[in-house]
Amino acid sequence: MSNDEINQNEEKVKRTPPLPPVPEGMSKKQWKKMCKRQRWEENKAKYNAERRVKKKRLRHERSAKIQEYIDRGEEVPQELIREPRINVNQTDSGIEIILDCSFDELMNDKEIVSLSNQVTRAYSANRRANHFAEIKVAPFDKRLKQRFETTLKNTNYENWNHFKFLPDDKIMFGDEHISKDKIVYLTADTEEKLEKLEPGMRYIVGGIVDKNRYKELCLKKAQKMGIPTRRLPIDEYINLEGRRVLTTTHVVQLMLKYFDDHNWKNAFESVLPPRKLDAEAKSASSSPAPKDT
């Protein structure tokens, strides 16, 4: 270990206060977690201020890089061009996406935070995509609702366009707008591939962050509900190193991107990091009218 690493570790030790005695009837792990949360609440304002300063610095650095390209008369790289927050030229994809958030008791607090962040990113994706979907979070309750009503209250989530929060999961069983035979549950655990997205359909996406702890969770739920299941064509286009499960945000982005040209291959290449794409599958599929969904 270098002297710099030793000094960094020493500084880290100095910054972390010693853990007070563990109260009777509480495990050390629970006490440590509670103290960590308390330190976060006490220093939240400081952390937020540091985050704002960093964000401002990065924004200035990005602007400076863009100006350098302009001054040299060169084309600005795509990665430096920020997408507009709202796409004013959007058209309706004609589909509904339901984020099934009924798995609260299967996630820890950190995973609930991750899920809430994925929901906000799904909303952002729906605002920016060329084709929007009617997205609904159901059921919206327990810790997810609590987080939106507190930490994420300033997002004004109650007024999001094309994005609704429902108190129960009745919508998954069909309603006056869409019958049950027009509903499909998307899960990586089924064998049947989703060939195409069709207007007038309602697609359910499992809203759970579980690091693959619960095998076939969404598949079994869909079977119990009597809802047909399909999987995105992950195996055909990408290599996830053993894990065929995408985040909720990625699934929503892929579905929205699909409507640009109804080509799953292009959607995967556009949404997912290039390092995840399966080179063999990319070269094997180049048909103009893809079966690839």
Curated annotation (Swiss-Prot):
In which compartments does the protein localize? Cytoplasm; Nucleus
Keyword list, A-Z: Coiled coil, Cytoplasm, Methyltransferase, Nucleus, Phosphoprotein, S-adenosyl-L-methionine, Transferase, tRNA processing
Residues carrying Phosphothreonine: T16
**Impact reported for Q118A:** Completely abolishes catalytic activity
Q: GO terms for molecular function, please?
A: tRNA (guanine) methyltransferase activity; tRNA (guanosine(9)-N1)-methyltransferase activity; tRNA binding
Q: Which PANTHER family match?
A: TRNA (GUANINE-9-) METHYLTRANSFERASE, TRNA METHYLTRANSFERASE 10 HOMOLOG A
Assembly with partners or alone: Monomer.
Physiological role: S-adenosyl-L-methionine-dependent guanine N(1)-methyltransferase that catalyzes the formation of N(1)-methylguanine at position 9 (m1G9) in cytoplasmic tRNAs.
Q: What is this protein called?
A: tRNA (guanine(9)-N1)-methyltransferase
